[in-house]
Amino acid sequence: MATAARLLPKIQSPASPAVAEARRRRPSSLRLGVTSGPARTLKQKLVAKSAVSVVEGENAFDGVKQDTRPIIVIDNYDSFTYNLCQYMGEVGANFEVYRNDDITVEEIKKISPRGILISPGPGTPQDSGISLQTVQDLGPSTPLFGVCMGLQCIGEAFGGKVVRSPYGVVHGKGSLVHYEEKLDGTLFSGLPNPFQAGRYHSLVIEKDSFPHDALEITAWTDDGLIMAARHRKYKHIQGVQFHPESIITTEGRLMVKNFIKIIEGYEALNCLP
């Protein structure tokens, strides 16, 4: 089992040039989740719009518990983040979005979110602002879903090593992903096996040094790359290497709905309101 001693030091390296450029390009008007001012109104409108779009369309709210406490989305300066938010809105989830350098872990803790979603993003886990520290400090007590960069943060937080993929960069590639059907309560409940997933990455969690004592591999590609993992003890910490929100991924909405169910299961187990 992983212990606190196994976690990596909370050291954030300076952003790489690619990450700095991505941050420079992002318009400041997308700052959501602040506590006052026009941006807060924008955040509220986005949440409402995401929820209303489903009320007028599909019945995606069915079976999903409504809760006023938000899911915190940590935006690692990635254009896919708001597609993930749209999926959460479609299943009736209340969420707030913060860039990875616009909020502290302590501030997130004070919000007491139902769950945390760590988005994709450029660079390595060291370029992800508070994302790595969030996994370390809040993951054990808060359901957490890491996507692409988010999974890599989970891997590093619990002793894994993030390396260049031996098969090079993939961008918008559809791959068959296989998952372990014997495991209950994963992001893949009810999905066909295998299913097609959209991949956009050059880094992976290294298989040879994978921290099997802390994490378990839950999905993989035909060539053996790790596509998903979860914590052995804190089973509410899960992540995927591919992009559920990509149009290439056939079952992305169901994975997001499964994350909400993981949150609900955690709340029931711990007698949370």
From Swiss-Prot:
<keyword id="KW-0934">Plastid</keyword>
<feature type="active site">
    <location>
        <position position="245"/>
    </location>
</feature>
<feature type="domain" description="Glutamine amidotransferase type-1">
    <location>
        <begin position="70"/>
        <end position="269"/>
    </location>
</feature>
<keyword id="KW-0028">Amino-acid biosynthesis</keyword>
<dbReference type="InterPro" id="IPR029062">
    <property type="entry name" value="Class_I_gatase-like"/>
</dbReference>
<dbReference type="GO" id="GO:0005950">
    <property type="term" value="C:anthranilate synthase complex"/>
</dbReference>
<feature type="region of interest" description="Disordered">
    <location>
        <begin position="15"/>
        <end position="35"/>
    </location>
</feature>
<dbReference type="InterPro" id="IPR017926">
    <property type="entry name" value="GATASE"/>
</dbReference>
<dbReference type="GO" id="GO:0000162">
    <property type="term" value="P:L-tryptophan biosynthetic process"/>
</dbReference>
<feature type="active site">
    <location>
        <position position="243"/>
    </location>
</feature>
<comment type="subunit">
    <text>Heterotetramer consisting of two non-identical subunits: a beta subunit and a large alpha subunit.</text>
</comment>
<feature type="binding site">
    <location>
        <position position="152"/>
    </location>
    <ligand>
        <name>L-glutamine</name>
    </ligand>
</feature>
<keyword id="KW-0809">Transit peptide</keyword>
<keyword id="KW-0150">Chloroplast</keyword>
<comment type="function">
    <text>Part of a heterotetrameric complex that catalyzes the two-step biosynthesis of anthranilate, an intermediate in the biosynthesis of L-tryptophan. In the first step, the glutamine-binding beta subunit of anthranilate synthase (AS) provides the glutamine amidotransferase activity which generates ammonia as a substrate that, along with chorismate, is used in the second step, catalyzed by the large alpha subunit of AS to produce anthranilate.</text>
</comment>
<dbReference type="Pfam" id="PF00117">
    <property type="entry name" value="GATase"/>
</dbReference>
<dbReference type="InterPro" id="IPR006221">
    <property type="entry name" value="TrpG/PapA_dom"/>
</dbReference>
<feature type="binding site">
    <location>
        <begin position="121"/>
        <end position="123"/>
    </location>
    <ligand>
        <name>L-glutamine</name>
    </ligand>
</feature>
<dbReference type="GO" id="GO:0004049">
    <property type="term" value="F:anthranilate synthase activity"/>
</dbReference>
<protein>
    <recommendedName>
        <fullName>Anthranilate synthase beta subunit 2, chloroplastic</fullName>
        <ecNumber>4.1.3.27</ecNumber>
    </recommendedName>
</protein>
<keyword id="KW-0822">Tryptophan biosynthesis</keyword>
<keyword id="KW-0315">Glutamine amidotransferase</keyword>
<keyword id="KW-0057">Aromatic amino acid biosynthesis</keyword>
<keyword id="KW-0456">Lyase</keyword>
<feature type="transit peptide" description="Chloroplast">
    <location>
        <begin position="1"/>
        <end position="47"/>
    </location>
</feature>
<feature type="binding site">
    <location>
        <begin position="202"/>
        <end position="203"/>
    </location>
    <ligand>
        <name>L-glutamine</name>
    </ligand>
</feature>
<dbReference type="GO" id="GO:0009507">
    <property type="term" value="C:chloroplast"/>
</dbReference>
<comment type="pathway">
    <text>Amino-acid biosynthesis; L-tryptophan biosynthesis; L-tryptophan from chorismate: step 1/5.</text>
</comment>
<dbReference type="InterPro" id="IPR050472">
    <property type="entry name" value="Anth_synth/Amidotransfase"/>
</dbReference>
<feature type="active site" description="Nucleophile">
    <location>
        <position position="148"/>
    </location>
</feature>
